[in-house]
Regions:
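Structural motif
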Residues: 15-17
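Histidine/acidic residue-rich metal-binding segments in metalloenzymes
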Residues: 2
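Histidine-acidic metal/acid-base catalytic patches
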Residues: 7-9, 20-160
Length: 160
């Protein structure tokens, strides 16, 4: 499939979506063995159910799949009164995706809840993503400013 994709200049991506594909370690290992430049992953925040009895850790799974990511899917189901997704800690997830792995591409939105309309669920997810993005940006800028101030202090006092 990747050979055909290569000829057409199309990436072939695999989403964790139940069964073995929801085992992040297994899927990452499979993608590593394929070792084709057109083969990648679409880590989905909410698809880590291996079977009826086994759930794979979503944060570990996304972490394992991000080196192969060609896109990211922010799946949501339900929100609390503060607008936080109750099944996935979006702050923790985006720290992994954006912070640790440096993702700068698109983040798709999937709403699969039943309490909001599809449109309202998508909007609630977008609002949450934008809020977390702004918080992460502010945190990064504060860290850069602190590093800059520390560096300036060293430069001023460095000759003593």
């Amino acid at each position: 499939l990747c050979v055909v994709g290569d000829e057409a200049k199309i990436d072939v991506i695999v989403e964790n979506h139940g069964g073995l594909s929801s085992n992040g370690k297994w899927l990452a290992g499979t993608l590593k063995k394929v070792a084709h430049p057109r083969c990648g992953a679409l880590p989905d925040f909410g698809n880590f159910r291996i079977d009826e009895k086994e759930q794979y850790d979503r944060y570990q799974g996304v972490d394992e799949l991000m080196p192969f990511a060609r896109g990211v899917s922010a799946k949501s189901h339900d929100f609390d009164e503060r607008g936080e997704e109750i099944h996935t800690d979006f702050h923790r997830m985006l720290e992994l995706v954006v912070g640790k792995h440096g993702w700068r591409g698109f983040v798709g939105i999937e709403y699969e809840g039943g309490k909001l309309s599809e449109e309202d669920g998508i909007q609630a997810t977008r609002t949450l993503l934008e809020r977390v993005r702004d918080e992460l940006t502010a945190k990064l800028e504060a860290a850069k400013a602190a590093d800059g101030a520390a560096g300036a202090g060293k430069a001023e006092g460095g000759g003593k």
